Amino acid sequence: GFFFP
């Protein structure tokens, strides 16, 4: 993820 896993 980028913002979230």
UniProtKB/Swiss-Prot annotation:
Any GO molecular function: toxin activity
UniProt key word Transmembrane: yes
GO biological process: monoatomic ion transport
Location, primary (coarse class): secreted
Any one annotated GO CC term: membrane
Compartments, record wording: Secreted; Target cell membrane
Positions in coiled-coil regions: none
Keywords annotated in UniProt: Ion transport, Membrane, Secreted, Target cell membrane, Target membrane, Toxin, Transmembrane, Transport
Record-stated family: Belongs to the pardaxin family.
Oligomeric form and interacting partners: Monomer. In aqueous solution exists as a tetramer.
Functional summary from the UniProt entry: Exhibits unusual shark repellent and surfactant properties. Forms voltage-dependent, ion-permeable channels in membranes. At high concentration causes cell membrane lysis.
Protein name: Pardaxin-2
Organism whose genome encodes this protein: Pardachirus marmoratus
